[in-house]
């Protein structure tokens, strides 16, 4: 999965951030998500585009997997965002079984070994870096 501060509100990162801001401002008092145990590989869209550019410009016809190669749980995302706003997510989180996808694999992440070996490429921003960029953007939007 790729993320950036330009994502629309329907995506997970922005949903978590929006709820935390709303809770901090007493506009909302809960965040409903599916399982917090789901783990995914999230990379910054800018890093992904740099990788795509390298692949296209190489003209070698090879297939490459682009990603961080690191699974991160939804729980980790929620904890980071809520901690950023000095909130304890446990006071606001509600698991909603209706948000669970059937047959969803619990852990899903990439193996970017080949692109690193061939081009020296790897993601520059961590998941927390991406979350901070997204939070900063949302705070700008809320304050304008």
Predicted segment positions?
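C-terminal substrate-binding subdomain of Rossmann-fold SDR/epimerase-dehydratase oxidoreductases
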Residues: 12-144
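Conserved catalytic-site region of short-chain dehydrogenase/reductase
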Residues: 1-6
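Active-site loop immediately N-terminal to the catalytic Tyr-X3-Lys motif
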Residues: 9
């Amino acid at each position: 999965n790729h993320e950036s501060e330009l994502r629309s509100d329907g995506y997970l990162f922005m949903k978590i951030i929006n709820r935390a801001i709303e809770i901090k401002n007493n506009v909302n008092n809960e965040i409903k998500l599916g399982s917090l145990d789901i783990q995914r590989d999230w990379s910054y869209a800018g890093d992904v585009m740099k990788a795509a550019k390298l692949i296209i410009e190489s003209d070698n016809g090879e297939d490459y997997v682009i990603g961080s190669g690191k699974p991160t749980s939804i729980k980790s995302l929620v904890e980071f965002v809520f901690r950023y706003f000095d909130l304890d997510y446990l006071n606001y989180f509600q698991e909603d079984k209706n948000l669970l996808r059937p047959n969803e694999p619990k852990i899903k992440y990439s193996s970017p070994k080949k692109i690193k070996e061939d081009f020296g490429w790897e993601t520059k921003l961590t998941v927390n870096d991406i979350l901070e960029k997204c939070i900063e953007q949302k705070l700008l939007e809320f304050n304008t």
